[in-house]
């Protein structure tokens, strides 16, 4: 969660979490991991994730029990309506 920060669109005031850190496959990943960032900036993301998990706990358990192939997409789009249906979510 430390790889994300909360940003606010200056025009719409919409708040979203944006990833700023490289992923393991990126060329700069090894250099980036040598750095240490101390920040409470990830706390809103952690709280948002915990809230979603609490709110959709039954749906999450049901999908896991069914061994759904597209668990992230089903949870994000169909069960919670938190995402657009065309999105591909691989990070859950």
Curated annotation (Swiss-Prot):
Disulfide bridge map: none
Coiled coil (UniProt feature): none
Record InterPro entries: CNPY (IPR042415), DUF3456 (IPR021852)
Pfam family, one: DUF3456
Similarity-based family: Belongs to the canopy family.
Stated name of the protein: Protein canopy homolog 1
Species assigned in the record: Homo sapiens (Human)
Gene it is expressed from: CNPY1
């Amino acid at each position: 969660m430390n790889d994300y920060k909360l940003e606010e669109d200056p025009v719409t005031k919409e708040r979203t979490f944006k990833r700023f850190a490289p992923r393991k496959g990126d060329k700069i990943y090894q250099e980036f991991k040598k750095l240490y960032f101390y920040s409470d900036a990830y706390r809103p993301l952690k709280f948002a994730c915990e809230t979603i998990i609490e709110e959709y706990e039954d749906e999450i358990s049901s999908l896991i029990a069914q061994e759904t192939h597209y668990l992230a997409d089903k949870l994000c789009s169909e069960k919670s309506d938190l995402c657009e249906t065309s999105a591909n979510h691989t990070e859950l």
